[in-house]
Structures are given as structure tokens and as C-alpha cells.
């Protein structure tokens, strides 16, 4: 039975409501969040979702910082926190044990909405998904996050929609887990996975072709190449090799079973060897598509820095997934907001403008006293409330 959510009980700033509205529209369809015992929930799912969005949007430094703000900040207490407030123990219990199914549901539905709202760039290259992994520093008590002796790390395996500029599918593992097994799980048929050299795997190349999935993956320059057919190379192009080949040694049982295309080009003295089964693109377009792989690197850097996604508020694998999905949802909401308000992609300039705009609207409405608008944070910067 779908959850039934009453209209939101507290008035918020117009800008915050505009940001939050796409998620709010999904709530009536969201699976019901139920208590696992006889005790009533201290936070319903909407409370949990809003608190986590608030955490990422306002760059709180820790979960304790967020709980303190939910208690002491006038706006957060009245507009973000549960009706009866929230204690630290109840907040962390909720994050570590509840809400993941609901967050995943909201995330999937937001991805569908974003795919309609955002224009597609690079349409001439087809649907491109950059795939990469990112390590998250963990603490020693997170025993599941195995990495190496005296060090704990978790790893996100993420697919990033290059055309839309948004994250797509993800998986979370310990830091030692390999990245190649997740390519097929992340990539949908008809899409093209764009990966660096760490994903070179000749068995993977064969299986992706058998599954009707495409790839543009850089390989090592010393890979054994068996020429099947040479393709024409345009004059004056940075491309110096374009052919149908088999990769690997039959003697060592590493050879691909299905021929693929191999394109090589030189940029600023560096040679790039790209394995692909995209035969509809020119060699120069293959080079262009591989260059776009850096968009996932840029996303990870921006996401970590400006939404504080890797400032852990949970230590269980479940809780970390809750935090990651909340960070992704926040990013998608910002993507929709920036497109609708400015016809632009997400940028820190627009995020800062949003924070200040929300603050100004609350001041004008007289929703809280000036004492609550200025909080000491890190380098005594202006603390913009939402």
C-alpha cells in the first residue's frame, strides 16, 4: 500500500520549496517506512529525507553538528526537524537502520524526471555512461570496509550519465573490491560505457558485446594485438591507428573471442589506445567520447567538496548507503533547480546563490530572529540557512 503523506505542515521559503518540490511529489508513491519494533518512529521518512538534504545542502561538518542545528537553530527546528524534535541517538539509529528502500525509490524516480528536464549534450555520440570507482576513508571500527592493514576504506562504483551530467546507478563495497565486475551491472543495453585503463578485461569485452552493450575503454599500449582488418585513417588527424582486432594472446588464453575496434591517437605527446565496439562513430568521435570520461572525475570532486558527502554520519554499510543516496538526491534536486531557474548545470555559484536567497526570504518573512542567521562555521563564514 502506498504511503499517504499529508500536505507539508510547515511553511518554508519559496526557494526551498522549489528545490524540494520534485522529491515531495514522489512521497505519496514511496513505500511506507515502518518501525521494526513496538516503538513509534521518532522520524518519519519525510523528516529523515529533509534532514539529510539539509545536511548536504548546508555543508554540515558531522551528524552531531546537524542534530545540534536541528535543536538550536530556529528555522531548522521549526521547518526541518520532526514535530517533537529529535535526539542524537534517535537520529543515528534512523540513519543506520531505516530509510534506504525509500531513498532508493526517490532517487530512481528523480533520475527519471531529470532525464526529461535536462537537455542532452553530446547527442551525436549516443548515450554515454562514464564508470569509475571512488574510495571513501573509513574508520577502523567499520570492520566491513576492508582495504589494507591499519586502514579502512569503502568504495563507490558509480555510473555517470555524461549526456545529462548526472549520476545514475551505483554500488557500495569494501575498498578492496574490484571495479570491473560492476560494469555490466551499471551499464544498460544500448548505452556506451566509457572507462579508463583499470577496466581493461578481455573477458569483459566479449561479454559486453554478447549482452548488446557498448564500451569505449582505454587499454595498455603493450597489449598484444592481432590484426583482423585495417580501417582508413583520415589525413591530418591525431588518429594514427584504426582497425578491427583481437586483443591478447591465444597462447596465454587471454585473447578476445569476438573482434573489436581499436583506435589510437596522440595528444600532446601521449598515445591513447581505445578498445571499442562503436563502429558507427568516426575515430575522432571515439577520441572525443573518451575525453568526456573526465566528467565523472569532476563530479566526484565537486560532490565531495561542496555537498560534504564523504563526511561520515554513519558507520554501518547500510547507513553509508543511506548517506550516499541522500547526497545523490540532493545533487539531482540541485540539477533540476538550476535547470529550471537558470537553464544551467549545477555549479557552486548557483548553490551559494540559493542558500543566500533562502536566507533572505526567511528574513523578509520574519520567520526567525537575526540571532539565528549567523552561525560560526569553519572560518567564521556566513552561515546560510535553508
Model-assigned labels for residue ranges:
Residues 111-119, 178-180:
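A short, well-structured juxtamembrane/interface segment
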Residues 1-65, 69, 96-98, 105-106, ...:
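Single, function-defining residue in the core of a domain
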Residues 79-98:
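Major-groove recognition helix of helix-turn-helix-like DNA-binding domains
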Residues 101-113:
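Short Lys/Arg-enriched helix C-cap and helix-to-coil transition segments
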Residues 71-81:
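Extended, structured, electrostatic nucleic-acid-contact surfaces
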